[in-house]
Amino acid sequence: MHFTGITVAFLKQFALGVEETLPLLFTLGMGITLLGYAVGKKEGWSGFESLYWSFITATTVGYGDLRPLKKTSRVLAVLIAFLGLTLSGIVIALAVWAATFALKTTPG
């Protein structure tokens, strides 16, 4: 098995998939960012804390060092988590699609 050929095929196919879904990926990322900023503003966090918290929440890591206390912020947190799961799912699906393509089309 030639890993170099598979790797190149995977990267080309993955890049193609990202290019095709870029508007959706960008929209999800902006949604996470803007909703995180809204939560941060409501909670009195700095811009950096808001951005940090929104991406920690979107990736479902959730360290717990920052947490929303207001009801509206908590509802937005659920929405951010949903957007993050959707974004992660799309990226994983693209990776699986690209890997499957690379394995099927690379000789050897």
Language model regions located:
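Pore-domain transmembrane helices of cation channels
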Residues: 1-41, 86-102, 107
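Membrane-interacting alpha-helical segments
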Residues: 4-15, 19, 48, 52-59, ...
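Outer-pore turret/helix-boundary of cation channels
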Residues: 22-55, 67-73
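Pore domain of cation channels
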Residues: 49-107
